């Protein structure tokens, strides 16, 4: 039996103290190990606010291609308006850069601001508070960075923003002799997301509403035929706070995780996959929370679902869905 230990996050948040910043705040974040989702002016969803987090996709506001939890060497800055009362809506802008291989001192293998950094640049502009909010975000993903969640077809490593591609090289063309050599693909991704939420003033049988929509495009060279070059996702989350008793919540989220919308060569994919999540959270004691949940995915393989039939016909009748459940227990001390 092996036991491994490590630090998940190491970073420092430093507010800028200046008498001129009376109505505004400016915070700098820097560290050798941090996530880009920890350096945002606001979280653009109320679905998981103070509640359970069951599936990663719903926990990331339904747009994991932008809020992809990229972890590595990071620096960021958050600008935010100050409000008279806590929870009042405020405008904020945040920017951060995360190099997932920033801890490697060799620029051939990693480092900061190199071709091999696996860098993520995320910028968010938002306006919101406790009751409502809206945010627009953009993430530039260097080659080697992923979109985190989606169909199996969309998340295939050979299709997902790889840094290298195999190119055939003739050594003796007259003899038809040659071999594949590795060549930089110069790929990167451009990811956009728009989110909004509304929370009722009183808890009970009126739910909060959270929505999200995202689009992505992968650019570069050397794409395999039929590989995805564009994708999108959308999400709707409803959450009832204190619906059974104080501290007990009910949530339902549904939508379509990241799925391909365009293939290299101008082909149209059949990559759609619907997801539904339902959970009920019970505050058993002051320190213990129990959350039973169920979830369903209609076509998690996406475009690969056709591989289940012998002819691999995208117009065929191949089906494959998943229904699952989870009981989450949280202990706080």
PLM features: residue spans?
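Short, small-residue-biased leader/transition segments that mark boundaries at the very start
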Residues: 1-11
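Residues on the lipid-exposed face of transmembrane beta-strands in outer-membrane beta-barrel proteins
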Residues: 9-14, 75-79, 123-127, 194-198, ...
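Repeated loop/turn-to-beta-strand initiation elements of outer-membrane beta-barrel proteins
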Residues: 19-28, 83-95, 131-136, 144, ...
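Outer-membrane beta-barrel pore domains and translocons
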Residues: 33-35, 80, 96-100, 139-141, ...
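Outer-membrane pore/translocation modules
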Residues: 37-84, 90-125, 134-136, 140-189
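Extracellular loop and loop/strand-boundary signature of outer-membrane beta-barrel proteins
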Residues: 60-63, 107-111, 177-182, 219-225, ...
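Detector for outer-membrane/organellar transmembrane beta-barrel domains
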Residues: 116, 128-264, 269-278
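Predominantly the C-terminal beta-signal and adjacent terminal strand-loop region
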Residues: 276-333
């Amino acid at each position: 039996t092996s036991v491994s230990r490590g630090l998940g996050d190491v970073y420092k948040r430093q507010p800028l103290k200046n008498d001129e910043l009376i109505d505004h705040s400016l915070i700098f974040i820097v560290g050798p190990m941090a996530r880009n989702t920890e350096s945002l002016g606001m979280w653009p969803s109320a679905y998981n606010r103070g509640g359970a987090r069951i599936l990663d996709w719903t926990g990331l506001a339904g747009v994991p291609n932008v809020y992809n939890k990229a972890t590595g060497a990071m620096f960021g800055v958050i600008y935010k308006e100050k409000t008279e009362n806590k929870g009042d809506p405020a405008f904020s802008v945040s920017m951060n850069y995360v190099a997932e291989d920033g801890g490697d001192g060799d620029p051939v293998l990693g480092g900061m601001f190199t071709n091999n950094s696996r860098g993520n640049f995320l910028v968010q502009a938002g306006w919101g508070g406790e009751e409502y909010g809206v945010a627009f975000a953009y993430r530039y993903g260097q080659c080697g960075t992923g979109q985190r969640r989606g169909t199996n077809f969309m998340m295939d490593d050979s299709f997902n923003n790889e840094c290298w591609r195999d190119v055939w090289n003739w050594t003796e063309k007259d003899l038809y002799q040659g071999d594949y050599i590795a060549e930089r693909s110069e790929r990167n991704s451009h990811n956009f997301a728009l989110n909004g939420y509304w929370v009722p003033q009183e808890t009970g049988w009126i739910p909060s509403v959270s929505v999200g929509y995202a689009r992505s495009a992968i650019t570069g060279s050397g794409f395999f035929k039929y590989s995805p070059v564009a994708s999108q996702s959308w999400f709707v989350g409803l959450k009832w706070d204190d619906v059974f008793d104080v501290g007990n919540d009910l949530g339902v989220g549904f939508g379509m995780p990241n799925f391909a919308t365009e293939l290299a060569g101008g082909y149209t994919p059949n990559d759609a996959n619907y997801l539904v999540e339902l959970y009920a959270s019970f505050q058993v004691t002051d320190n213990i929370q129990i959350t039973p949940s169920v979830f369903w995915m209609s076509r998690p393989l996406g475009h690969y679902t056709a591989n289940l039939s012998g002819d691999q016909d995208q117009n065929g009748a191949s089906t494959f869905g998943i229904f699952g459940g989870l009981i989450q227990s949280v202990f706080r001390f």
